[in-house]
Amino acid sequence: MRSWRVINHPNSFQGNLKKKNYFEGWYNKIVSGDEKSIFAFIPTIALNKDYSTSHCAIQFFDGSAGRVEYFKYDLSEFENLSELNYKIRIGNSVFSENGMNLDIDRNGSKIKGFLRYTNLIRWERNILQPGVMGIISYFPMMETYHGIVSMNHTVDGILRINGDKNVFDNGRGYIEKDWGSSFPSSWIWMHSNHFSNRNLSFTFSIAKIPFLNLKLNGFLCIIWNQGRFYKFTSYSGAKILKLDIDSTVVKFIIRDKRYILMAKAIKGSSFDLRAPKLGIMEGHCIESMTSKIKIKLLEVDKNPDKYNLIISDFGRNAGLEIMDKNELA
C-alpha cells in the first residue's frame, strides 16, 4: 500500500532520489490572452538503473512555432520545496501551483520571466477519490499514475525567450502530472480550455494499462463547466460506446447513468517530445497544441428517448496526442 501522505497529496513530488526506473513530470500549459503564445513547460525527474545517467530536466514546447527543447540538469539541481503541494526547483527555475519563475540558460537558449497563476480550478478530492484515478490511486506498482493539478486558471506575467517578449496578461493555463516507471504502450490524450464559454474546460485520456497479468483500457474524461465537474471514468462505471481512431482524428461517445458525451478531436501540427521508458527519457510523444475539439454533453431525461442539451461547444488551442498502436479501439 502506498503511504497516506503520498496518496493524499498527489500534486506534490511523489518519489525520492533513491528510486530506480522512475519518472515524474508536471505538464504546465500556458496560453497568452491574445492566444499568440502557446507554450508548455514540463519539469521532469528521470531516475534510471544507472545513476550516472539519471537527471532532471525542463522540456519546453512552443506549440505555435513547433519548437521543442530539452534542457538537461544534474540531479543535484533538483529540489523538492514542499511535502504537501506542487513546488519544485530545477536549476534556477521554480515551478509551483502559484506560478513559474523561469531562469533557463541552456543549449544556446535563454528563457527568463515570472508567471503568476490565480483562480485555479482544482480536482474535488475525497477519501475514495484522492486523485483523478479514484480508488486506483491506492494501488501500488502501477506503471503510470496520472493527476490533475488545475483544470483551468488565469496566467499573468511576462516571459522573455531569447530576447523576445511574451506577455501573458489574462492568459489561461492547465497543469497535470504523471509519475511511475513508463508511459503506457498506447494512449490518447486531449485537452482544451479555450471554448466560446470561458468557464469550460475539458480533458480526456485513454490508455492501455497493465494490471496483474492483464492489459486493460483505462479512461478518464473530465468536464468543468460553470463551476461544476462532470466526470466519466472507467472506475465509476461509465462506458465508451464508440471509439474511432486514425492518425489525425479521434471520435468517441461515452455514457453513464445520467449523461452522454460525444466528442471529436482534429489534430493540428504535431511535434516530437521525449517520454519515459523505465525512467529513461528515450520514448516519444507526438503532441499538438493547435488541435480542435468539438464536444456535446447531453443529460438523459426520465423519458429514455429524450435528452437535454447541456453543452455544445468547440475548443481551440487544444493539446492532442494520438499514440495508439492499434490496442485501444
Predicted regions and their residues:
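Structured soluble/peripheral alpha/beta segments that form catalytic or ligand/cofactor-binding pockets
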Residues: M1-A329
